[in-house]
């Protein structure tokens, strides 16, 4: 069984909040501020993660510019395009084969959040480095960035996906950092593919600009 390899979904990689950290606080008005760590928050605030049933941050945050392209970190299939109050717009995908990670052979479910827009649709097959969307700060975020998650998955006897570590305190997510390669997914693309991405990015920005004017 091949070991899992994830390729960085952004061209450059500046990690902000890491997996398991508990440094974000929230008040009754949904205002976010930084705490001093370990769930310690200013007066009137509580841990954002504990409030949402988590031990801490269940992914890694990577700094990004508005509309910065985000690329698929693995080969696989798009499961869904989702929009949530906390995480904003996101893309969820699954590998088509098992890999060895976290001590077993699992399918790798990767989740990408806080998008401005997406470039894929459910059930679409994607390859490492395919453009899947653009970074933003949708949902509850203090600025534009990519929230990236990894979850080990299996299929039950009915063919339904289930989360292997659902009760681990991170909604089944595990730290993706040990599986990240030095290369970005973008670096694996050909020059022609990169040109197509640039055209798609420009078209999306123009469309967004026109929509904002109407």
Q: What do these predicted ranges mean?
A:
Residues 61, 92, 111, 134, ...:
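Conserved beta-strand positions that form and line the central face of beta-propeller blades
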Residues 119-144:
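Beta-rich strand-turn-strand
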Residues 64-66, 117-118, 122:
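Active-site acidic-Proline motif in GNAT/NAT acetyltransferases
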Residues 1-89, 98-102, 127-128, 137:
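Surface-exposed, glycine-biased beta-strand/turn segments
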Residues 2-17, 103-105, 121-127, 149-214:
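Acidic, glycine-rich catalytic/binding loops that coordinate metals and/or anionic ligands
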Residues 79, 133, 177:
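Nucleotide phosphate-binding site architecture
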Residues 55-58, 72-119, 141-152, 158:
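Zn2+-dependent peptidoglycan hydrolase active-site motif and core
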Residues 64-67, 106, 141, 170:
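Soluble non-cytosolic domains of exported or imported proteins
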């Amino acid at each position: 069984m091949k070991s899992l390899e994830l390729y960085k979904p952004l061209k450059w990689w500046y990690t902000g909040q890491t997996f398991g950290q508990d440094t974000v606080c929230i008040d009754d008005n949904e205002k976010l501020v930084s705490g001093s760590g370990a769930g310690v928050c200013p007066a009137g605030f509580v841990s954002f993660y504990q409030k949402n049933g988590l031990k801490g941050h269940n992914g890694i945050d990577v700094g990004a510019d508005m509309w910065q392209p985000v690329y698929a970190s693995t080969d696989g299939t798009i499961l869904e395009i989702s929009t949530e109050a906390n995480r904003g717009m996101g893309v969820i995908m699954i590998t088509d084969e098992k890999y060895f990670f976290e001590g077993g052979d699992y399918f790798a479910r990767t989740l990408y959040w806080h998008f401005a827009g997406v470039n894929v649709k459910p059930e679409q097959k994607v390859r490492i480095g395919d453009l899947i969307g653009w970074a933003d700060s949708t949902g509850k975020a203090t600025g534009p960035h990519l929230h990236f998650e990894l979850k080990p998955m299996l299929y039950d006897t009915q063919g339904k996906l289930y989360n292997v570590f659902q009760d681990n305190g991170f909604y089944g997510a595990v730290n993706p950092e040990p599986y990240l390669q030095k290369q970005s997914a973008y670096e694996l693309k050909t020059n022609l593919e990169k040109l197509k991405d640039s055209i798609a990015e420009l078209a999306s920005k123009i469309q967004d600009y026109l929509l904002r004017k109407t």
